[in-house]
């Protein structure tokens, strides 16, 4: 440890007794002495000092650079340096996880870590690396402006989650990075709790911009004039200087003037939008204060009429039809607030993507694979407000996941590894919060799944309904309760509140708004409006607005599900890296630099699991490594193991090395790994290794470098010359041989299709593919030029049908003209008018939501069903489905029997002249048809036409080929039951018909029909 005098112990591991009383006593002494950092091994416990500390200057940075944790007093710089050294020495990705509740100092901790990394890198002073460092530092100012806000507990609270990967090259200099954001609390844009403020950006614009800028945005300095700002606190912080800092950060990150203008115009537009008011006059909804509407439209660069229409009306598209519905005042207010929240959320996401473009590694993908990263996680802390809503629910779930990760990595895995390796160990009990994570995220049973089910339900579903569903499904969960489940609990409001017992304590959530916030609905009208903005940057934020107005949009994933998935992805990312922990603690709720609230601090120590962490650390080991890797890294420091140890196993070699260096008292030998207890031992090993490496490298360079370079150069030069000449020769030979073979292709009947192409050389594989395409294009033109272009669609279908049937059915209508929609023809169908009406009705009111544009084929049929009955029906093939219709007597009524073409598994037909066809469905409900005309059997074969059309559409929809069976014994499934259809010739039959026989089906046809 450093020799300076400090209160208490610098590492909790050194406490003479492990108890909550001793832990708290040490924490209190250090806080009152101004020592805000204390270790638990390699975990840093950070107390928010609520004052400026003079411990972050250049001199302090130099003091911690390249030093081990135990060499200096505890500091965030030491944690940052440890993470950086692991990356530099082992090329191992690392991450620094900063956790703690809101106001505990997480954001400041992340900035201090970033400052240190920027200070200790780029020793050679390269301009590009210096630019990247500045961009990484300055990005924080922008993110705080647009993502942070004043809450009752924290003047600069992050209202979004941030994870930054800083990318380092092989010299361990920063070359780029990428920021991922999580769940911006956008509801704060339109409403704040008493004493809290909106995002800093609004106040910076009003109080920091000059008069000319405010006139340009048609704004006034008084925040009280704006509805979205006057609901909460109007305290003045440091907005004027912060505004200048934000604008300077924009310049540093390379934002153009146009982009910065878009950002501030959008912020101003949200303020004006909040002041738009609605009034109902003679049953008509109107906007009463047109000036704010006009200002909003101007700033968003849309027309006033378009904005007014989007706010007061809604376009509804269904079945290709478009209609407009008027809003009432309540709906208009909801739409306005939803628009304001969405605008700010999209702007924030766009700003982060723009920052990422500035800091993203500019090297090639090949280079990027070899880079290492340090991840810094600064995410919202655990929150308990007077009124806790959907946002607090998501934030606290996020903290549960991070706590679970900490438990998994620090407590659970470490103890399990000791037991697995045979290290003597006394198991330490701890609370595993997996049960709380499951309460939220468990599929089908968790709160998010219950919310999603409620959001997807048909009809009006209220928050009260959702709470009832949660009570029903979670009534027996030990960490969930509500007033309905606990009628005597007066703390909970009836039909409004529910309580979750989190690892950090009980939180009462108000259910009101959960459904709306989870759905996160925004009318398509607003997306179209902003996509059509003349501001190109704003338009870029709304790509969905380009969608056709008639197109019905799919229901997007809910906010809860998206957040759950993002948390799962974050955990996967963190598990790939070696973690370092900073556990932030809030000393009091008064933001005082002197008050140490015992109860408040002890509560945080308990739920963060710091005492359990201490017990594991005291009994555990600072480092462990597989024997083979340990020996590979340190073998050069011992004469007995360098250059290779041949006197036994890797374990024996490690033991020899450790005993020679006199570290045997500080290590334990597991089954597959060595465990080192003290960081001093690891430091000594690293120090000796670092002293040896220059000598080894110099020796190797002296002996080998010159020989390798000369040999490789000669080999490479010779190889390139030979390969280049050989490739050119083989390619010329191939092209000449091909030209000779294809010389008479134009005079051949098949235009050279039967000509065998020569085998291309390896260097000519790509050329061969291009030559094949050129030849196929030429040959197709030679074949098709004698046919009118109007016949090409039928010709294409006939080719598809011929390919599918593969010569297995001699008669398939190849010699006639194919019409397709026969029932729409008056010569084929006396009831064609009724048929056309039925098709129109089906198109406008699809039974299963599957719409279609056109009918590709239609015919009268005789169908056979699972009741062993045949009946006269009709069917159509559309561009997506196969529909069964009633017969002409019932005016072709839709029988609600549909097979989606993409759900077909195959088609079966017979080889004869009969018109039998079976459509096999993946749902085991096949369709069995015999094609007919209205009054008599068909005089022409139409099976080939049906096969060609269905096979083409199936390929269009799925990208794969549909199997076609040609046989007289067809297996099918009618309503799930397996049946066999046998085609039999019958001398006394004039018209084909079906009849049941012993559970199967006989299809009787005239003898002349059989092959």
UniProtKB/Swiss-Prot annotation:
Protein topology in the membrane: Peripheral membrane protein
Superkingdom, natural source: Eukaryota
Cell membrane in keyword set: yes
Residue stretches making up the Myosin motor domain: 7-690
Phenotype seen when the gene is deleted: Viable and fertile. Mutant embryos and adults display normal foregut left-right asymmetry, but inverted left-right asymmetry of the midgut and hindgut. RNAi-mediated knockdown in the hindgut at 0 to 24 hours after pupation leads to inverted left-right asymmetry of the adult hindgut, but knockdown at later stages has little or no effect. Adults display inverted left-right asymmetry of the male genitalia.
GO MF entries: actin filament binding; ATP binding; calmodulin binding; microfilament motor activity; phosphatidylinositol-4,5-bisphosphate binding
Every TH1 domain range: 806-1007
Distribution of this protein across tissues and organs: In the embryo, expressed in gastric caeca, midgut cells of the proventriculus, and in the mid and hindgut. In the larval gut brush border, expression is in the terminal web domain. In the adult gut brush border, expression remains in the web domain and has also moved into the microvilli. Also expressed at low levels in follicle cells during oogenesis.
Phenotypic consequence of residue 382 to A: Loss of function in specification of gut left-right asymmetry
UniProt keyword terms in alphabetical order: Actin-binding, ATP-binding, Calmodulin-binding, Cell junction, Cell membrane, Cell projection, Cytoplasm, Cytoskeleton, Developmental protein, Lipid-binding, Membrane, Motor protein, Myosin, Nucleotide-binding, Repeat
Main subcellular localisation: cytoplasm
A cellular component annotation (GO) from this entry: myosin complex
Listed GO biological process terms: actin filament organization; actin filament-based movement; determination of digestive tract left/right asymmetry; determination of left/right symmetry; endocytosis; hindgut development; imaginal disc-derived male genitalia morphogenesis; mesoderm development
Pfam families hit by this protein: IQ (PF00612), Myosin_head (PF00063), Myosin_TH1 (PF06017)
Intracellular or extracellular location(s): Cytoplasm; Cytoplasm, Cell cortex; Cytoplasm, Cytoskeleton; Cell membrane
Entry keyword annotation includes Transferase: no
Impact reported for residue 156 to A: Loss of function in specification of gut left-right asymmetry
Domain remarks in the Swiss-Prot or TrEMBL record: The myosin motor domain contains the derminants for dextral twisting. The two IQ domains are essential for activity in determining left-right asymmetry.
Self-association and partners: Binds to F-actin. Interacts with arm. Interacts with shg. Interacts with ds (via intracellular region).
Additional facts recorded: Overexpression throughout the embryo reverses the normal left-right asymmetry of the embryonic gut, giving rise to a gut that is a mirror-image of the wild-type. Ectopic expression in the larval epidermis causes dextral twisting of the entire larval body. Ectopic expression in tracheal precursor cells causes dextral spiraling of tracheal branches, giving rise to a spiraling ribbon shape instead of the normal smooth tube.
Entry similarity comment: Belongs to the TRAFAC class myosin-kinesin ATPase superfamily. Myosin family.
Role summary: Unconventional myosin that functions as actin-based motor protein with ATPase activity. Binds to membranes enriched in phosphatidylinositol 4-5-bisphosphate, and can glide along actin filaments when anchored to a lipid bilayer. Generates left-right asymmetry at the level of single cells, organs and the whole body via its interaction with the actin cytoskeleton, both in the embryo and the adult. Normal left-right asymmetry of the larval midgut and hindgut requires expression in the embryonic hindgut epithelium during a critical time period, 10 to 12.75 hours after egg laying.
Protein name per the record: Unconventional myosin ID
Gene: Myo31DF
């Amino acid at each position: 440890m450093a020799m300076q005098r400090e209160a208490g112990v610098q590492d909790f591991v050194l406490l003479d007794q492990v108890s909550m009383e001793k832990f708290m006593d040490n924490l209190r002494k250090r806080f009152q002495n101004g020592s805000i950092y204390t270790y638990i091994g390699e975990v840093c416990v950070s107390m928010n000092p609520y004052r400026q500390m003079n411990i972050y200057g250049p001199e302090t940075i130099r003091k911690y650079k390249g030093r081990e944790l135990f060499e200096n007093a505890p500091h965030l710089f030491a944690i940052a340096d440890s993470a950086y050294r692991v990356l530099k020495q082992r090329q191992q990705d690392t991450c620094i996880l900063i956790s703690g509740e809101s106001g505990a100092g997480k954001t400041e901790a992340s900035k201090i870590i970033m400052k240190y990394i920027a200070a200790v890198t780029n020793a050679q002073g390269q301009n590009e690396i210096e630019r990247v460092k500045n961009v990484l530092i300055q990005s924080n100012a922008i993110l705080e402006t647009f993502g942070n806000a004043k809450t009752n507990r924290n003047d600069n609270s992050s209202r979004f989650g941030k994870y930054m990967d800083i990318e380092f090259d092989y010299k361990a200099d920063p070359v780029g990075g990428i920021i991922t954001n999580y769940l911006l609390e956008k509801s704060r844009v339109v409403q704040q709790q008493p004493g809290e403020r909106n995002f800093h950006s609004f106040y910076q614009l009003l109080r920091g911009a000059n008069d000319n800028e405010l006139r340009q945005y048609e704004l006034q300095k008084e925040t009280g004039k704006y509805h979205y700002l006057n609901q909460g606190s109007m305290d003045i912080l440091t907005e004027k200087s912060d505004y200048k800092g934000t604008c300077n950060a924009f310049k540093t990150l390379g934002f153009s003037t146009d982009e910065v203008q878009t950002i501030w115009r959008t912020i101003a537009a949200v303020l004006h939008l909040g002041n738009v008011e609605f009034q109902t006059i003679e049953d008509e909804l109107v906007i009463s204060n047109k000036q704010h509407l006009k200002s909003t439209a101007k700033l968003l660069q849309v027309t006033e009429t378009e904005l007014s229409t989007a706010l007061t009306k809604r376009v509804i598209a269904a079945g290709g039809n478009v209609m407009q519905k008027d809003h009432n005042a309540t709906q208009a207010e909801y739409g306005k607030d939803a628009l304001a929240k969405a605008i700010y959320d999209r702007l924030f996401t766009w700003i982060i993507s723009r920052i990422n473009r500035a800091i993203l590694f500019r090297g090639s993908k090949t280079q990027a694979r070899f880079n290492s990263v340090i991840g810094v996680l600064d995410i919202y802390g655990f929150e308990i407000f007077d009124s806790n809503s959907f946002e607090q629910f998501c934030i606290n779930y996020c903290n549960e996941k991070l706590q679970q990760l900490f438990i998994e990595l620090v407590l659970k895995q470490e103890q399990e590894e000791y037991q697995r390796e045979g290290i003597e160990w006394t198991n330490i009990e701890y609370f595993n919060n997996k049960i709380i994570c499951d309460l939220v995220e468990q599929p089908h049973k968790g709160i998010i799944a219950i919310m999603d089910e409620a959001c997807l339900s048909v009809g009006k579903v209220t928050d009260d309904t959702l709470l009832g569903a949660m009570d029903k499904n979670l009534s027996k969960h030990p960490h969930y309760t509500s007033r309905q489940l606990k009628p005597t609990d007066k703390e909970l409001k009836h039909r409004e509140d529910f309580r979750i017992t989190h690892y950090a304590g009980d939180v009462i959530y108000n259910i009101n708004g959960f459904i709306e916030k989870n759905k996160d609905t925004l009318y398509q009208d607003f997306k179209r409006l902003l996509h059509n903005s003349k501001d190109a940057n704003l338009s870029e934020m709304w790509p969905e607005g380009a969608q056709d107005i008639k197109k019905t949009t799919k229901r997007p994933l809910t906010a809860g599900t998206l957040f759950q998935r993002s948390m799962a992805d974050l955990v996967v990312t963190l598990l790939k890296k070696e973690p370092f922990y900073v556990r932030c603690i809030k000393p009091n709720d008064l933001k005082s630099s002197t008050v140490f609230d015992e109860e408040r601090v002890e509560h945080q120590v308990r739920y963060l699991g710091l005492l359990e962490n201490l017990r594991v650390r005291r009994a555990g080991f600072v480092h462990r490594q597989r024997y083979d890797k340990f020996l590979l890294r340190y073998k050069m420091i011992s004469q007995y193991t360098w250059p290779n140890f041949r006197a036994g196993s890797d374990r024996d070699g490690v033991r020899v090395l450790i005993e020679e260096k006199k570290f045997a008292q500080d290590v334990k030998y597991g089954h597959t790994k060595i465990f080192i207890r003290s960081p001093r031992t690891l430091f000594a090993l690293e120090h000796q290794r670092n002293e040896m490496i220059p000598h080894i490298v110099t020796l190797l360079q002296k002996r080998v470098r010159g020989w390798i370079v000369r040999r490789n150069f000669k080999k490479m030069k010779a190889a390139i010359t030979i390969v280049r000449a050989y490739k050119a020769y083989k390619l010329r030979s191939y092209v000449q041989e091909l030209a000779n073979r294809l010389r008479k292709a134009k005079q051949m009947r098949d235009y050279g299709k039967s000509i065998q192409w020569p085998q291309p050389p390896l260097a000519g594989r790509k050329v061969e593919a291009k030559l094949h395409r050129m030849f196929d294009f030429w040959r197709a033109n030679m074949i098709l030029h004698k046919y009118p272009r109007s016949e090409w669609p039928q010709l294409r279908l006939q080719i598809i049908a011929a390919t599918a049937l593969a010569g297995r059915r001699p008669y398939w209508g190849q010699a006639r003209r194919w019409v397709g929609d026969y029932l729409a023809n008056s010569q084929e169908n006396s009831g064609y008018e009724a048929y056309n009406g039925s098709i129109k009705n089906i198109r406008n009111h699809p039974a299963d939501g599957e719409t279609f544009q056109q009918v590709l084929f239609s015919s009268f049929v005789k169908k056979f069903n699972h009741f062993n009955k045949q009946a006269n029906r009709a069917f159509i093939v559309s561009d997506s489905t196969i529909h069964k219709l009633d017969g002409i007597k019932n005016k072709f009524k839709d029988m609600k029997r549909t097979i989606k073409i993409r759900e077909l598994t195959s088609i079966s037909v017979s080889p004869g002249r009969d018109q039998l066809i079976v459509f096999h469905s993946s749902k085991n409900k096949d369709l069995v048809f015999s094609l007919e005309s209205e009054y008599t059997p068909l005089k022409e074969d139409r099976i080939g036409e049906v096969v060609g059309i269905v096979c083409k559409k199936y390929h269009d929809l799925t990208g794969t080929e549909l199997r076609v069976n040609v046989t007289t014994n067809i297996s099918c499934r009618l309503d799930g039951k397996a049946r066999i259809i046998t085609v039999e010739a019958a001398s006394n039959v004039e018209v084909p018909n079906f009849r049941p026989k012993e559970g199967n089906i006989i299809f009787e046809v005239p003898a002349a029909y059989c092959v």
